[in-house]
């Protein structure tokens, strides 16, 4: 038995994302006064009282037909079809607007159980005839921001969804447990959402030629070769100097937070847009956060065959030159829209995830260390004593992190550390993941 699904529907800025966050087990949606912040349907585990369910937030819809509007309607329609119950939301402050009437008719034609949720009711509220004209038999007044009215909402939900079919508190959720969290990041319009849609074979995310369609991180649980994967689509990251509006700043912050929580990050690059400093900045940020990284060059089908070899040579040169701290990053060339080479990306993610989790025994580490340091000795210091690295151990994985003991660690140069790291990558087959060294002074400086 699976959890019942509740979908939030309404025009822009009625408070759907605020209620989504209020009912979610953890906050997931960006909230902003600007209408239309939500553009994809978002899923989360929700809870109200003892009742647990799957909650879907949908884009705000209005009456203006255009390419973007049609795609938003498609996202909302899919969420309605999935729903066991619809919470149709309106704004008590603005009252019933023409868009509310149009959307209520749109929702009712699907004959789904529904509740009219009148939001932003910070004071006592009386329903007038305009609310009844929307055609819903259940109406609740709440304030999602302040959490008032949720007990009444709970009672209505239970009345609409029989308890024995709805409450799943003692049933294991197959989505929960260990999973590989993959964040898809990159500059705007690189094809991140198109790539995820191609992988899961569903128009789950809004796509189009407009840059910046995705405004917040969207999580999708998925299975690939018996591996539980959480795919996370993110808003495109631009240079700080070009981010001016507060909403875009929120989106950028949301993306950066998603990277911090990722296991692996796919850096999506547009083959038609030259590799820019911002791409390298994103990659450096991923590495500094200790995440594993796979670089994907999208729209490869649009590059002329005669230019592909030169493109790849220059691309590898730029990556190896500007990201020497993670030599061997997997680079794949794909066409998301044509589904070309997209599964190779997931295979690369699974492989680098294993490397990111790699544990090396202390005996093997020190056998390697003795051989490597003897092959390239550190210079003699004043007094004729040589700086030595005598012993090492792995202290953690994700990323692989090592503690090295030296008689004089402050004299170990960055270039010597790079020598050790690069040699370790080759010796233990660890390409493309951050490797961290910390040095500790031994008690006896003459050892």
Curated annotation (Swiss-Prot):
It comes from the Bacteria. Disulfide bonds: none annotated. GO terms for biological process: ribosome biogenesis. Pfam families: KH_dom-like, MMR_HSR1. Residues 358-443 form the KH-like domain. GO terms for molecular function: GTP binding. SUPFAM superfamilies: P-loop containing nucleoside triphosphate hydrolases. GTP 1 binds at residues 10-17, 57-61, 119-122. GTP 2 binds at residues 186-193, 233-237, 298-301. Gene3D superfamilies: 3.30.300.20, P-loop containing nucleotide triphosphate hydrolases. Transmembrane segments: none annotated. Keywords: GTP-binding, Nucleotide-binding, Repeat, Ribosome biogenesis. Residues 4-165, 180-357 form the EngA-type G domain. The keyword Nucleotide-binding applies. Belongs to the TRAFAC class TrmE-Era-EngA-EngB-Septin-like GTPase superfamily. EngA (Der) GTPase family. NCBIfam families: GTPase_EngA, small_GTP. GTPase that plays an essential role in the late steps of ribosome biogenesis. Associates with the 50S ribosomal subunit. This is GTPase Der. It comes from Rickettsia rickettsii (strain Iowa).
